Amino acid sequence: MKKLILSAALTGAATNRSHCPHIPYTPVELGEEARRAVDAGASIVHIHAREDDGTPSWRTEVFEQIHAEVRKRCPDVIINYSTGAIGLSVEERIKHLPATKPDMAAFNMGSMNYGIYSKRSKQFYWNGIFENSFDTLIHVVKVMTENNICPEMECFDTGHIRNAEPLRDMGLLPKNATYSLVMGVMGGIPATPENLIHQIKQVPEGSFWQSIVISRKQWQLSAIAAAMDGNFRVGLEDNFYLPTGEMAKSNGECVEAGATLARMIGREIATIAETREMLKIPLNS
């Protein structure tokens, strides 16, 4: 079996330290967490920016500070920045990309209802429309390719996978664009084994894909992804808890658990250099 590529989502935007006290906020904390993730086996770090108080940030200077802190500690790791937000213009969502030129960036492949719902209180904590029209997709992928940024196509439902087809037909989608099968978000496809297998079948043959599972079901579905010759993402953005049920104290612990799981299935973990070769991603900045 080919080596497995581990990604680590370090912080996210929808949670805070009242949910998990170990979520990194500041550029220095993100740099330190990136190092812990890399030491445990991650080749890719996916990062949202935050202000020092933990609120989501889209200020370019914050991304630049994060970039410097991560590169200082992890000179060769593949940096992947978020571009997703509700209520912001597409220009606000991607203005940090030309300034920082990360190796990869999240490329959200379709519009959807998006929210966090509590069954206990029977209400939404927040919700909105995550808007990504085809015009938006065309604009974003052009900015990414102009800046040598590999698009990480985040697909929250089956139709999002198909949305790549016209972009590829127009010659806009780089050959090394990757598929992320995101599951468990309210408004997107539920996180079940059957749904993951269905999503995998929709991905064009020969394409790189990984599972992203937003819940404690992450470990069950990550095992399926690994067994089906795919890859998976872990980290405090997606799931605070280790397979034992204990809350993780760092992203490094999440990655270590993921590496152990992969090796139990017979998959060795790809190094950063091997990941760059497999995905055809040269060091961008």
Each model region followed by its residue ranges:
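Active-site mouth loops of central-metabolism enzymes
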Residues: L10-E32, S82-V90, W126-E131, E152, ...
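Catalytic alpha/beta core domains of metabolic enzymes, predominantly
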Residues: M104-E237
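Glycine-rich, proline-tolerant flexible connector loops at the mouths of alpha/beta enzymes
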Residues: S18, S43-Q65, V182-M183, G187, ...
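Active-site beta->alpha loop and helix N-cap motifs at the rims of alpha/beta catalytic domains
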Residues: S57-W58, F63-E131
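N-terminal small/glycine-rich loop or linker at the start of catalytic domains
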Residues: M1-H22, S111-F124
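Conserved, mostly hydrophobic/aromatic
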Residues: L30, A37, H48, A105, ...
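Structured C-terminal cap/extension of enzyme domains
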Residues: I197-Q202, Q220-S285
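Alpha-helix-loop-beta-strand connector modules within alpha/beta enzyme cores
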Residues: A8, P56-Y81, L137-V140, M144, ...
